[in-house]
Amino acid sequence: MKVVPEKNAVRILWGRERGTRAMGAQRLLQELVEDKTRWMKWEGKRVELPDSPRSTFLLAFSPDRTLLASTHVNHNIYITEVKTGKCVHSLIGHRRTPWCVTFHPTISGLIASGCLDGEVRIWDLHGGSESWFTDSNNAIASLAFHPTAQLLLIATANEIHFWDWSRREPFAVVKTASEMERVRLVRFDPLGHYLLTAIVNPSNQQGDDEPEIPIDGTELSHYRQRALLQSQPVRRTPLLHNFLHMLSSRSSGIQVGEQSTVQDSATPSPPPPPPQPSTERPRTSAYIRLRQRVSYPTTVECCQHPGILCLCSRCAGTRVPSLLPHQDSVPPASARATTPSFSFVQTEPFHPPEQASSTQQDQGLLNRPSAFSTVQSSTAGNTLRNLSLGPTRRSLGGPLSSHPSRYHRELAPGLTGSEWTRTVLTLNSRSEVESMPPPRTSASSVSLLSVLRQQEGGSQASVYTSATEGRGFPSSGLATESDGGNGSSQNNSGSIRHELQCDLRRFFLEYDRLQELDQSLSGETPQTQQAQEMLNNNIESERPGPSHLPTPHSSENNSNLSRGHLNRCRACHNLLTFNNDTLRWERTTPNYSSGEASSSWHVSTTFEGMPPSGNQLPPLERTEGQMPSSSRLELSSSASSQEERTVGVAFNQETGHWERIYTQSSRSGTVSQEALHQDMPEESSEEDSLRRRLLESSLISLSRYDGAGSREHPIYPDPARLSPAAYYAQRMIQYLSRRDSIRQRSMRYQQNRLRSSTSSSSSDNQGPSVEGTDLEFEDFEDNGDRSRHRAPRNARMSAPSLGRFVPRRFLLPEYLPYAGIFHERGQPGLATHSSVNRVLAGAVIGDGQSAVASNIANTTYRLQWWDFTKFDLPEISNASVNVLVQNCKIYNDASCDISADGQLLAAFIPSSQRGFPDEGILAVYSLAPHNLGEMLYTKRFGPNAISVSLSPMGRYVMVGLASRRILLHPSTEHMVAQVFRLQQAHGGETSMRRVFNVLYPMPADQRRHVSINSARWLPEPGLGLAYGTNKGDLVICRPEALNSGIEYYWDQLSETVFTVHSSSRSSERPGTSRATWRTDRDMGLMNAIGLQPRNPTTSVTSQGTQTLALQLQNAETQTEREEEEPGAASSGPGEGEGSEYGGSGEDALSRIQRLMAEGGMTAVVQREQSTTMASMGGFGNNIIVSHRIHRSSQTGTESGAARTSSPQPSTSRGLPSEPGQLAERALSPRTASWDQPSTSGRELPQPALSSSSPVPIPVPLASNEGPTMHCNVTNNSHLPEGDGSNRGEAAGPSGEPQNR
């Protein structure tokens, strides 16, 4: 029977005995358990591990919550029983340290681990294991099991592999846009519906930093080459690439060119499923594909790297020598260059031709892939020929049959490093056509980009599939070379599958060489050049014959001219030429042909020669979550002129406006070779030249800069080196220049459109004109669009040299560039700040603290949230879609956590307040559909907060801390983690309240630091927690028993206790109602303000861990003036200092604020109290040394020391109401808090060690790297929100955070 939800635990238990069930009763009881156990005394117990490992890295729990797996530096994995704390299994076999480990969420006894040498192992605790190695032995950064599918995600370098461990190798892989964008974390939500990825954000400084994952010699050479580039491939190509060169894999029912999922070279292909209806999306889930692959017959099993030509006998047997066509007029050099084969080539970032070695130039022709597929259409039937100039593939989905009279030479428009990898294109007239989509590794998945048109008289028509991703320059290449007669091609019963991959570096390398070879041939047919120009311009009409074409004079001249086609795309008006002298892309000026005729898509005649097997044309559509990226190109061989025609409008997310899409229909017309090939002519006027350069900078959309990047840009200096005035002046110059250019082009727009509609075909042979250039960017906008585009385009540009893409580090005010070290805000310049942080990170990592170093370093990660309900492969190459958190810090899998109910995400994000080192913020985001990505809770920490774990009920969060300090004084306990209660959403620093610290029991003789690498809650509510340290310890902490007197405070957990205001206590003078006042203060105020009435102590606070809410307490709540209690008012740093002066009036506060603003070393001495402040304001590194000295406590420290209480035996804390214990000092992100005898930079020892010495302790600069260094051994969960977690964050008396 279901009853009304009950809130009373006693009634719930009573009703459960009677057999009634209340809604939410189980959750309420579990929450009650979590609340109860936080008051209990926690005891930590070390797990006895074999071999005494030196360090423990990562922890993972089994789905039945009984086993705990831990990875260690001795290359082993130990399995421990949670209940007994005994090690029951040792997994031995990794050659290097396992960096990640995870249990399968639903299959008991299945565990996966990945180590630093690139090996992934899946262990069965009942016996046996499977292993797989990455191709280049890159470290495995993260692993994630899908909860329901037999699927393991492997993050390594810049790739995510999808592996069904029943097969030998992963069946799919997706890549980021560049090698610098490494994948550091993958994580499924509890149901497997969503996938979380963490990927490195490229930045201007990243080229100067070493990669986080070790790289071998080959990768190092590529890495250095990228660092030398003055300009990288664009992040987002100009306007209409997203329309004309990217078709979503969600295209509806493309049965003519269905694309299949990536199949690795050593993995058999799945059987082709029957074609789906044309009304459905041809998307087959990865899980279904996994299952289908099991029974699929295969003839080849090879483990060769996909990017290397395999010479084994099995692979050699699969090569198709019969594909070599008979060549009549092509010399052997060209024949070798155009040998058709099937290729597997790993995508790589773009490298200009001049930076490649001569060996690569000699051998590149054999390795260059093709991104084109040619469809031969005739009356006899249709055959898809997939040709490429690369190593042969090892197996084919079916018999290959194609009988064209001539071979087809293809050079694909280059796909950047983020392009699809191993996409399969199939074309078949029968039902065996595979309908699997390509891996969605680019910003938008690629499908067959072609519109077929059958020629009259049975002549063959060529259809080209191209795809260009929004992150790279589009490139163009050669097309088909065929006879004009009817071909003898016939229908093929087996689908021909081609792995579409492109290596831009090799492509650019060999493009010019092939151009030289091809154009130097005397027997080149007119159709060859005709197809070449069609591809170079994508939708230019084909030229009728050689009589209309000027003959090139030399191969060198041809090479120079053809280089202009590397980025020539008539469809998107992006005419660029790579200048070898300046290493820059420059615009060229073509004169486009015009004609006066009606145009149409000719859809009805496209597939006339094909049987009705569900083949449909891809309709114009839009990609989900991004700008529309699908369109169709029509390539027709009919002799007709061309004319642009509007086919629709589409929304451009980049500009936020609707823009028109044009197509061209081919009629008669010719295009001159010079008009298509020649570079931009020199302009006589300097003003025009400047305008051209400004426009070039604006329109090319230079990418994020690696290495030298923007600071070596030929036109503009690094924005970080500009003063604010110069920076905004350049912005204004750019805006004015662009506005003027747009105004001029808008005036010419209608004129050129009219001229193009009335000019004859003979005008095509005229030379380029200025008007032709002006058509490049604005042809796709009408006058209204153009006026609306001006504001957003300029608004997105933070500096002229950055083009239309704005690095996000310039978007926020605190990240604006500054000139010099000091600025009016008192913050350092970006370059200085980055350099100092790198030095600090190097110093920290030299001390063995790589976790802290990774937080100090400038590298940040973006968290993206992918819908995996349909097993769609994530488009990780697109850095702008599904971004949940733009910048965060990731050290290992423990640096990010998803709650058990899948509703919360906890991660560390960099703070906007820069310092040395940068402080960080623990942020908890919502994963609920109604407020996805909304930041709910925040807390400031220093760079040594490296591990985060949400409690089983999602109401508490534990932060693991690293430390690199040496303990100067003996200590029996060391604070290694903090537990916070998620209290009030959107409450800023008050949204989380610290409830207790996790203390590590230390031997008395141990003086070295103790750091946590991973800390996790045990899966059951109230069961406890576990953590691993850098000493190799695995500790399980459990709540043992309630502390004495805690029940008295259980009913006082209401919000009224936590919101005690100083005004309500202003009349409570110490001594008026001594006993009552003492009790209330013990409950809500004493520890909150750092006041110890009987144990005066000297506290030193250097900002470094948690910034406090700006809150002042009344001085009368913390000042002891009774002579019988010397040193009764030892205030804590934090708001205690700020409230000290509350009784003295606002003048004291104003004075402190003024002195802190001035910076430098400042001392303020007043009657009965003194505050010493050290402020290095220019560097944002304020160190506060604060102590209060009572009049009668200045004679010595004996009396105070005699009254110290004995330490609690608990590993977490003692009873808060005991007056002998120290108040907790939670430190601000740059805070280090000591008690006098214990200068451990990490936390303070037991209260017994405290002293009432009034002498301040000097704080070294190095102390500001550890977050919370707590001296607290008490439970402070009952304190007001301004409790110990904020103790040290106030800037002393000023009441302001001193981290500015």
Curated annotation (Swiss-Prot):
Keywords: Autophagy, Cell cycle, Cell junction, Cytoplasm, Cytoplasmic vesicle, Cytoskeleton, Developmental protein, Differentiation, Endoplasmic reticulum, Isopeptide bond, Methylation, Mitochondrion, Neurogenesis, Nucleus, Phosphoprotein, Repeat, Transcription, Transcription regulation, Ubl conjugation, Ubl conjugation pathway, WD repeat. The record marks 483-484 as: Cleavage. There is a cross-link at residue 45 (Glycyl lysine isopeptide (Lys-Gly) (interchain with G-Cter in ubiquitin)). A motif (LIR) lies at residues 1044-1053. Disruption phenotype: Embryonic lethality: mice display severe neural tube defects associated with autophagy impairment, accumulation of ubiquitinated proteins, unbalanced cell proliferation and excessive apoptotic cell death. Cells show an accumulation of cyclin-D proteins (Ccnd1, Ccnd2 and Ccnd3), correlated with an increase in retinoblastoma (RB) protein family phosphorylation, leading to increased cell proliferation. It holds the Pfam family WD40. A motif (PxP motif 2) lies at residues 1207-1213. It comes from the Eukaryota. A motif (TQT motif 1) lies at residues 1105-1107. The modification Phosphoserine is found at residues 52, 329, 395, 444, 636, 640, 1044, 1206. PANTHER family: ACTIVATING MOLECULE IN BECN1-REGULATED AUTOPHAGY PROTEIN 1 (PTHR22874:SF1). This is Activating molecule in BECN1-regulated autophagy protein 1.
